[in-house]
Amino acid sequence: MDFEQLRQACTTCEKCGLCETRQHVVFGMGNPEAEVMFIGEGPGQNEDEQGLPFVGRSGKLLDQYLEAVDLYRDKNIFITNIVKCRPPQNRDPLPEEWDACLPWLREQFRIIRPRIIVCLGRIAAQRLIRPDFSVTKEHGQFFEKNGTWFMGTLHPAALLRNPRQKPDAFSDFVALREKIQQVCDHTYD
């Protein structure tokens, strides 16, 4: 299956109950040859309405951090969520919803083959790095797993709720830029 076939299959997914309440599947966006992949927990209301990840106020903030380190959604990264459909009232996804969506994310990994994965927020980091990951204590640190570097950082929505954490998040993006320069071949071409 190539990337476009994967996108088409994902947009018609009915593997869990979230398909009944969604407006759009939020497959992800960006460069399918990106060496850097950003992954959040799941789409919110704005994302569900537009079918794109990280839009609205938190998406604008994320774009500011990305641009500060020369990363752009349409050029040199790919951005997605673990769960591709919005849970009602933005609740945490249920275990069966995680399980239903995980094959989509695995296929995205397989096709994109990122060198670095940035987990946006505690829940994504706990799912992808390790269950006891503390985003407030371990943000900005890199962990190598099977040849891929993982980093957890504060979720942009959390930064909007607690602006005092913005400098910490910005330092994570500076560390990300340094890691990209160390391990990536074409992100900054």
Please place each PLM-identified region on the residue numbering.
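A polyanion-binding, active-site-adjacent surface
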Residues: 1-189
